Structure formats: C-alpha cells, structure tokens
C-alpha cells in the first residue's frame, strides 16, 4: 500500500497520549514521547511529556481532508504517526501507525513494563495495521444470527451479563501461534469500533454500528461460542470470523463517548434471550444483502436517521435495543439516577471513597470528606475526574461517570492487571 503523501495533509486532527504501568493501572508521569511520520520515523516532528496523570497535552497533527473519510475514496483518509515512549524505570515502547483523522481527537493508550521485569530490554514495536475500510481484510463468513442453545453439554449463560474482560485471540480460529489478549470490555468495543468505522461519521451512524459490534460480541459471550468448540478465548480478531481488533490501536473521543454512554446495551428480537449476532460488511468491497453495510449506514446518518432506524433499515422492524441486567467487575451498579449537589446517602459515600482512592495515584484529584453529602467539594472532585478521563465536565455523577469511576477505582486498587 503506498505511503500517504505529506503534501495532502491539509487538515488537522488531535492526539492525546495516556501512559500507564502494565503492572498496575497507574499513571506514569514525566514519560517523553517523540512523534514522527510513519514514513519518516527518524525525523521527529514533536516531543511531548506526560503530566502527573500520565497524560500529554492534546497535540495538533496534520491529517488528510475530512472528505476522504466521508465516502469511499482512492485517498487514504488518515495520516499515520510513529510514537517512541521513554520513561525512567520502564522499558521503552514504540508504536508504529497511529491513525489521525481530520477534526477528531485520538486517544493513544500506552502500557509500559517496569524495567526490572524479566522480559526483553525493548518490547516488540506495536504495529497498527490499516483500517478495515481502507486495507484488505477477509470478508465475514456468514452465520445464523441466533445460535442454537439446546445441545446437550453446551455452556450457555442464563442471562446477558456485561463481562469485565474479553479474551481476544489475535488471529484466525485455528492459529495456535496467535496471542490471546485480556481486554476490558469497554476498551475492546472502543478498539473494534475504531478499526471498523471512521470516527468522523455522524453520531447516529457511530451509535448504530457500536450497537451492532456490542451485540455481536455479547452473542459470543452469551453462547460461549468458542469455548464450546474447545478454545480458550471469547472472540477472534479475524474479520472472517468476528470483527477487527488491533492491540494498541488509537481510539477516538467521538466513539469513546458513545461507548461510555451505552456499553450495557445490545440488540434483541422478540422472544429471543441471546443478543443477536449482528453481522455487517463495508458495502463497497463486499456486499451483504441481509446485513448492515457500514457505508450505507453512514449515508443514512447523513439523512438524519436515528440509530434504531438505521439498524431496522438493515435488520428489519423486529430489532430493538435491550440493556444487560448485570455488569461484571464493578463494586456496585449505577443507582438509576444522577448524583449531584444535594444528594445524600451510601451511594454518595461510595463515590467519595472511590475518588479518594483514585487520588492516591492521580494526584491532581483533590481528597474530599467521606460524609455521604454531595456538596461543592465533591462536585469539584468529580469535575476534575471528568477532566482527567475525558468526560463532559459537569460535576454530576451520571451513568458514564459512575462506571468510569468504578473502572478506574478497580484498576488502581488491584495489585496487578490480568495481562
């Protein structure tokens, strides 16, 4: 595939880099990141450092015109950058191919291994392959959207549960050499969506596609599809079997915000307990009359279709949005209402305790009184948390904020991550 010409980079996108320790999900301050074009890795464009929260400032980077991602084009719609990350006491990390689209803020997660760990001095470079709408990937092998679940001995969950982790087999089903990755469910969905659709598309299109990705994934979880065939993973990264996942992939605020808002949702049909295996294709290189097409969903979003209208256009009128009853790996569930100034009780006390624990590792967060009363100091701490973790700075604990606080609290409280 030809390298993108830098003289076509007439627009700009943004990139923010978040650096954490792989041993524990805590930030790494004072890491330095050198940014260069992937096609010219030795010419450093910019050098940035992480703050006390392990985050860099938002960096403006040249990108191709936004029009390149709005319809199928002969022109690559994103620019590609290499990142070299260094920090005292950690092994260096190199990322090749971070993708930047016009007008969209990308978030690049970086996980570093402590220097004393008994692994090679430098990790293998993380290479981010082409986007599925730009590169060449095998088309999906068609399956029935509802799986038989009455075979003797088959493991099936009794209800739909949002898992804490997905085990991703980074290759085709039968590839014994492919690595398995433990990935938090929300991070997995954000990664897949960033691989499968362009973050510049209309919000309704992004939401419809994210719902299809989540429902497909939860069908694999609910039916224990691969485990029932003797495998030790939840899903593959092969587009022939599942959808694309790329370890280390840049994600985007426009997608991440939606995932944080709707991550417990999936797609249902009447009288069917399991999430529907909603298959899709690009609609240009591959056609799929019974499924959603990604480019087609983009044009429907342009025309003002709502997410459920886009989904019903492709999957039929009987499709509807459902919500999982249970979310794994969190201290307690969303109370069902916002916590704001004037709120009182155990849920407020729990949030105050969790914010104080997070503040031990994220020192820009203030420590607050644990009194079960949601006053100005709690609202300010929530606002600061939202600022650090890319949420709207409202000072109100809404659904996305509740679960983001839970996620970060669990991460910093654990002795070690699964991977």
Identify the meaning behind each predicted range:
Residues 23, 37-41, 89-91:
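Solvent-exposed strand-loop boundary residues in beta-sheet-rich modules
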Residues 18-22, 34-36, 86:
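Core beta-strand residues in small-molecule sensory/regulatory alpha/beta domains
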